[in-house]
Amino acid sequence: MFNLLRSMAITNLRKNRALYVPFALATVMVTVVLYVTNALAATPEFAHLEGGSAMAKTLGFGFVIVQIVSLVVILYANAFVMKNRAKEFGLYGILGLDRKNIQLLSLIELVVFAALSIGLGLILGVIFHAASFAILLKLIQYDIGIKYSFQFGSIIAVLLTMVAIFVLVFFLNAAKIYMSRPLELLKEKKKGEKKGRAVAVRAIIGLGLLGYAYYMSQSIESPVKALLYFFLAVLLVVIATYILFDAGSIALLSILQKNKKLFYQPTNFISISNLQFRMRKNAAGLASVCILSTMVLVTMATTVALQRGTTARLDSNYPTDYSAVAYFVLEKDMDQYPPIVQKIKEQTKGQLKDEKTFLNVLRFGQRTENGFDFANVNSGDSPAAMFTLVSVDQYNKMFGTNYTVGDKEMIVGHIKGDVKQISEVKTYSVVYNATITVKEMIDGTPYAKVMPQLPYVADNQYVGIVKDPMQYLNPVAGQAMYYFTWNTNTPFELRDAEWAAYKNVKSQYKADAMSLSSKNEEAKTLYAFMGSLLLVGALLSIAFFIGAVLVIYYKQISEGYEDRDRFVILQKLGIDQKTIKKSINRQVLIVFFLPLVTAFIHTAFAFKMYRKIIELFGVDGSVTLNATVVIGAIFVVVYLIVYQITSRSYYRIIKR
């Protein structure tokens, strides 16, 4: 009996290839995306790159999201196949094949289909991963510290995921066969989908989850918190999107149906009825396209923004060839560092230029009614503002100014943030509970251009010009920084030897609190990180976009076969071709552009959150905004091209 069922299963797959080819495309697509995402997360070189571990964790979370999308896409595709084959299974029952044998037949078909589709998907995934790796590394044109490596562990992870999904598919199919009578299966194809229970409750839950995710993305001000909560917000948006496209679309179509004046127009009647007929499957496909589109937009926008901000970040963090910075919290510790730096400079292979020394105190402020409060604030408190306090003598010497301040006065230079936020500030509370009056507001950007930027992020950043910054030094809530910067005219070929000599001198002293930096060496590290980010971002964006295109194509093909018979009946009832074509256009427009519009809404609400995260890398928010707008415009154009191509396939099937 088994041999007979096996033969029947293979014959059935061939006979129903019009149904299984789109299903295979969907399965291959999700397998490729799963493999690429997991293989990138498992890249061993990430462990040695700046920010590599964070990137690997992000990709690991992305793999979970792709698993969810894969589950929904395969369940959606399987539901279409089962609905169109229900009549066939019903005939088997009438002809005497019992339910257990029909279930076994279904299992054999599913095993053969899954083995071929998953196997092909893994092969294509490995090829795509390797080929795109080679092409992108060629385009980057410099060593980013990452090499292609085959990830056997990713093969196992994808196999486990896909096996789990198809086991679930089999049990759902088996339950359907077991619970349905042969006569019910014969009529299954012509039955519309049930609305499901508690539509209103599900819609409210979906709105609640989405609203909370949106609120979270807009209310978080700290970049560090944005990074921590970003993944939770993404997960909530994914769940809410599937719920709302399901329950929300059902509720919306029901409301439209109750509007008799709108519903009983021929064009609206046809398109709304068709959408209602398969509303739940429609929702799954539309939600998947929406999520994949959002992933493309956010991934590419962040990647491009980080790439464009690389040079600016390098120049702001390292304005000179070399720099040394010593951190201390006790004034008695400051005198040990100048002699060490002088010994380091003596190893220069060329001539020293532009030697500068900065003595600053860093303080963080929380917003008060009249300004900012320095008391009880440290760098871990997500401060509203960061103040770099510098002596008035040092500032005047640097810029040729002649400012004067008293013991309890400060001139505030605005570097970053909203000027209006402190235009009326009169007092500041400091460690000695002294009231410091803001004497004047000036532009602080000239100071920021010559001063190495600090590795802290705050929405508002200022330089505070005071008489003696050391009086603000506090072991708990503030620290002093001794900066030494200089350039050299050393030939390029001697720079490596010069840097090695510098490091050798530093290692001879117990100066753990002092760091030494080379702009050339930092550039290598930064470009390696950004290059790897570009590689990962491009690979994921391509994979997600291919996934979205294939889901769209699958929807058009599968729904074209479902709609063909219904439109033939409409023609027989006397409805003219013009009305039918108009209703088809309206239906296709809804199916195509609802996910696109929703993806842009998701991206708009996510913007503040990923802008904050990108600021951790020193990239200005305007760069992120410009990148998002440009990527969004390009995506719309490409999406329209996909719409034109795939909609033709739908029209061709309808006209057969």
PLM features: what roles do these ranges have?
Residues 17-45, 54-90, 110-124, 202, ...:
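Hydrophobic alpha-helical transmembrane segments of multi-pass inner-membrane transport and secretion
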Residues 39-53, 122-155, 211-228, 594-656:
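Short helix-loop junctions at transmembrane helix boundaries
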Residues 1-31, 195-200, 209, 244-293, ...:
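N-terminal Sec/SRP start-transfer signal
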Residues 314, 320-546:
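Basic-flanked hydrophobic alpha-helices used for secretion and membrane insertion
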Residues 109-256:
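Hydrophobic alpha-helical segments
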Residues 3, 7, 179-193, 561-565, ...:
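Short cytosolic juxtamembrane segments of multi-pass membrane proteins
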Residues 2, 6, 10, 104, ...:
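Alpha-helical membrane-protein architecture signal
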